Amino acid sequence: MAGHSQFKNIMHRKGRQDAQKSKLFGKLAREITVAAKLGTPDPAMNPRLRAAVIAARAENMPKDNIERAIKKALGSDGENYDEIRYEGYGPGGVAVIVEALTDNRNRAASDIRSFFTKSGGNLGETGSVSFMFDRTGIIEYDRSVASDDAVLDAAIEAGADDVVSGEGGHEIYASTEGYRDVAKALEAKFGEPRKAALIWKPQNTVAVDDETGEKLLKLMDLLNEHDDVQNVYANFEVSDALVAKMGG
């Protein structure tokens, strides 16, 4: 059941890409506001909002900022954001999924298409690459929360599909239908996770050479630094040495 986290070295770059806290907090606040607007403003009754609040806490976003983002959803003068998923191919034919929340669809599409084109890739139609990914739930805990065996046993009992434990922590995967129940069971045992969300997990990853990898990592940077982009997923692996070289 346990295994290697094939795309972890790409996900690790997210921390560096969002090094500017003001930009990161803006993205987190946007997700909180949208989640609260689509459901109830009570995180205990709104799974998406709870996931957004957990993500904000994990980045040490001040409590006042979180509460302000929730209250913003209750007002009538707040911005309206569209949720859009972009799909395309990066350098080397690598599949890329981009999730965005934008108040200007034309601007977002133009910018993201430009990023793909400049990197030597191309933006495709919705559905053009998502078939190579699985929509799945992920619950993450720090390494120190419990032993690998303890986490594995608890995850199996809770109904998880897979567990990956390593130096970076524990990752528990569950179906889209069951992950909230799994997260609730694990939280009762280990406390609040550092992450609980739905993601696009690549079914397989491809190892790329350093030249292609550098182009791909630059594309990841461009996408993640855009204000409208919330999440980026791709199905490639690069060497740890390249990630370190580029400051990941």
Curated annotation (Swiss-Prot):
It is found in: Cytoplasm. Keywords: Cytoplasm, DNA-binding, Transcription, Transcription regulation. GO terms for cellular component: cytosol. Coiled coil: none annotated. GO terms for molecular function: DNA binding. GO terms for biological process: regulation of DNA-templated transcription. Residues 1-21 are annotated as: Disordered. InterPro entries: Integrase-like_N (IPR017856), TACO1_YebC-like_2nd/3rd_dom (IPR048300), TACO1_YebC_N (IPR049083), Transcrip_reg_TACO1-like (IPR002876), Transcrip_reg_TACO1-like_dom3 (IPR026564), YebC-like (IPR029072). Transmembrane segments: none annotated. NCBIfam families: PRK00110.1, PRK12378.1, YebC/PmpR family DNA-binding transcriptional regulator. This is Probable transcriptional regulatory protein blr1534. It comes from Bradyrhizobium diazoefficiens (strain JCM 10833 / BCRC 13528 / IAM 13628 / NBRC 14792 / USDA 110).
